[in-house]
């Protein structure tokens, strides 16, 4: 698997680089560009080099954490609980969502705007697009919403596909290549605002319950002082330009228990093992 890697300068000589993994919830080059300024900030705050690792699939970040190849990772809730099955890791912080004012976001199921489908219970036998199989809002929560309407994604859909990212799912639905798809709502809004998909080309038919935000997760083997320094660096971000680039109003602490519901649902839906 090919990674997009970048060094962020300014670290003190002799310090080992902090290796950061990022799930590719959109195209890897876009993810790396989005988080490069954060890498620069962390390098400055921590006094060490920072290396970014953005693979082409979610499971590679879990694998890298399990193999001690990265120290810190931005996971979704599902990839975090997958990682904690295989490694000693802990969540530190998550972002405050500007659209909700808290640390949650939502997943949605969408259909083409001209579709006759009005509700999730009409999707039996439909062709459906998920994002990555390991995506919280692109796989797990759409599966939860389908299950709530009596549809088991494993047996009751027509054909289903994993597009690999929210942007690809939105494009597949907007073009009519599938009957419906699931993705993160705030990413859908961003894709419409930036013109990646035509505004109004898809229609939301279901919104999930609030989802706890993407956790920044650290290896427990790192010294406690280092883990605290990393958490403090996030909590102390006050640069409005940087926060805007990160699509965050700030950061708050999170705990392992905040993601227990994700683990419970993933077990029930056979999504706990990364693919």
Sequence positions of predicted segments:
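C-terminal motif of bacterial Sec signal peptides marking the signal peptidase cleavage site
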Residues: 3-7
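Bacterial signal peptide processing site
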Residues: 9-12
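Bilobed "Venus flytrap"/periplasmic-binding protein-like clamshell domains
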Residues: 15, 19-43, 55, 78, ...
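An extracytoplasmic/periplasmic, membrane-proximal ligand-sensing/linker region
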Residues: 18-21, 26-37, 209-213, 217-275
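Alpha-to-beta junction loops
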Residues: 48, 66-75, 87-90, 126-128, ...
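A ligand-binding cleft/hinge motif common to bilobed small-molecule-binding domains
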Residues: 77-88, 145-148, 174, 179-199
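Short beta-strand->loop
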Residues: 90-101, 156-159, 192-210
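Small-molecule pocket liners
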Residues: 105-109, 202, 212-218
């Amino acid at each position: 698997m090919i990674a997009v890697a970048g060094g962020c300068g300014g670290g003190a000589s002799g310090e080992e680089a902090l290796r950061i993994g990022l799930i590719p919830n959109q195209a890897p080059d876009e993810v790396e560009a989005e988080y490069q300024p954060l890498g620069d900030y962390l390098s400055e705050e921590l006094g060490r080099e920072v290396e970014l690792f953005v693979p082409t699939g979610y499971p590679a970040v879990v694998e890298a954490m399990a193999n001690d190849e990265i120290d810190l990772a931005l996971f979704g809730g599902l990839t975090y609980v997958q990682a904690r099955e295989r490694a000693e890791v802990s969540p530190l912080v998550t972002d405050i969502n500007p659209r909700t004012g808290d640390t949650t976001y939502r997943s949605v199921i969408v259909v083409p705007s001209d579709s006759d489908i009005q509700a999730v219970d009409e999707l039996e036998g439909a062709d459906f697009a998920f994002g990555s199989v390991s995506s919280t809002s692109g796989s797990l929560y759409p599966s939860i919403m389908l299950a709530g309407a009596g549809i088991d994604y494993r047996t009751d859909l027509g054909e289903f596909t994993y597009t690999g990212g929210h942007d690809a799912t939105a494009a597949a639905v907007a073009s009519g290549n599938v009957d419906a798809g699931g993705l993160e709502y705030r990413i859908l809004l961003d894709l419409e605002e930036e013109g990646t998909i035509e505004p109004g080309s898809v229609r939301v038919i279901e919104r999930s319950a609030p989802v706890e935000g993407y956790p920044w997760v650290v290896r427990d083997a790192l010294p406690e002082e280092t883990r605290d320094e990393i958490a403090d660096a996030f909590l102390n971000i006050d640069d409005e330009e940087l926060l805007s680039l990160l699509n965050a109003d700030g950061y708050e602490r999170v705990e392992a228990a905040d993601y227990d519901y994700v683990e419970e649902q993933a077990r029930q839906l056979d999504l706990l093992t990364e693919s």
